[in-house]
A protein has these predicted regions:
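N-terminal accessory regions of nucleic-acid-interacting proteins
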Residues: 1-34, 38
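Conserved acidic
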Residues: 26-35, 44-104, 109-373
Length: 373
């Protein structure tokens, strides 16, 4: 089921009963969930003398979900009429706003950016805004940056309000315009796209308490946790105790002097980013590759790291290091004599030439030691 632009007032009558919440910055936000999306067609036409860019793109349908009810339109004029009507009905101002979530806002932004006067647009890269605030109370946010999931994957994260992202029903090779009739399946594809986002945001609202508690990005949850547990701004006693405990821990790991810092720098080694010596300069066929997802946060939880200052350990032997390596981290200078790779085909030799203070007759491949006296 979907609605037309003329059904807006009826939908808002019900949606605006939820009232508004006030953020930490004293901005009032309507407790109404808006999700926006467009479908476009791209095509190529013969360039003119004035315009050498042959690629064109046109919006042929847009959809706006308001608390789970989806309004569909085919033209930008309909969209702008709808936005003006929402502005008037919600009495929007710079201090009283609605949040409109857009999955991959950077794409839609290129189509709507000239329709509004923007107070602030924050981008993480060139043409990659994650939110934009208009002067008349519309705050567009990127739900992809919030979740780090595609729409298909986002539907799998829903626990309470289950909506499936339809896959494969839109043939993107077809050129469609606002005059192109859409089938029921094509319309359902459009509807589900905004319903998935709406359902996810609704679950976030229920989990966080209200709409103002939802952060801008996925890392916002982590930053909030750190602020709550580590940074004290006065007030309740237990928060002061949390801060003191955290502050004491940080001080206990503080680097003691410049020499220790230099030693830590010498011990640090980066990742393997070069080609394996056995295959360098060759063209290989039928190869595959893999990458680790969220590797940094994973190793922060799965691996062990020093949580105390390094202290001198006199008369430390190799056996001591091997025996205690599960409980303690060691930092030391190692002297090796007559070293050679056990497996000459090892693609990742561990010894880095640049970290050696001296090296006798080394055989080096791309900064890694294969053999030395």
């Amino acid at each position: 089921t979907y609605y037309g632009v003329n059904d807006l007032d009826t939908i808002l009558d019900e949606a605006l009963k939820n009232g508004y919440s006030i953020s930490n910055t004293q901005i009032e936000y309507e407790n109404t969930i808006f999700a926006f999306d467009i479908e476009t067609s791209s095509f190529t036409e013969k360039p003119t003398k004035e315009d050498h860019n042959e690629k064109r793109s046109i919006m042929y349908v847009w959809q706006l979900a308001i608390n789970g009810r989806v309004i569909i339109g085919r033209t930008w004029n309909e969209f702008l009429y709808l936005m003006n009507r929402i502005h008037d009905r919600c009495d929007l101002t710079d201090k009283h706003r609605i949040i409109i979530w857009v999955h991959n806002f950077s794409f839609e932004f290129q189509f709507i950016r000239k329709f509004f006067e923007w107070k602030k647009v924050f981008a993480i890269d060139n043409r990659k805004p994650i939110y934009g605030i208009t002067i008349n109370g519309f705050e567009f946010r990127c739900s992809y940056i919030l979740t780090n999931y595609s729409l298909a994957k986002l539907s799998d994260q829903l626990h309470k309000y289950h909506v499936s992202k339809m896959v494969g029903d839109l043939d993107y090779s077809l050129v469609r315009t606002p005059l192109t009739p859409l089938t029921d399946k094509e319309l359902q594809y459009c509807i589900n796209d905004v319903l998935v986002v709406s359902a996810y945001i609704k679950e976030c609202c229920e989990q966080e308490g209200n709409i103002t508690r939802i952060p801008l990005t996925a890392t916002g949850y982590c930053r909030r946790y750190v602020r709550h547990n580590c940074l004290y701004k006065g007030g309740k006693k237990h928060k002061e105790e949390q801060f003191n405990k955290y502050h004491t821990l940080m001080l206990s790991m503080q680097i003691q002097d410049v020499e220790e810092y230099k030693q830590l720098k010498r011990a640090f080694m980066g990742g393997f980013t070069h080609a394996a010596a056995n295959y360098s300069s060759y063209t290989l066929e039928n190869v595959d590759s893999i990458d680790f997802t969220s590797s940094y946060p994973y190793v922060m939880l799965s691996e062990k790291y020093p949580m105390e200052r390094f202290n001198d350990y006199e008369d430390c032997s190799l056996d001591d290091i091997l025996d205690m390596s599960e409980q303690y981290a060691f930092m030391y200078k190692l002297i090796l004599v007559d070293v050679e790779l056990k497996d000459p085909h090892n693609p990742m030799p561990a010894l880095q030439y640049s970290k050696c203070t001296s090296c006798v007759n080394p055989i080096v491949d791309n900064g890694r030691i294969l053999k030395a006296d």
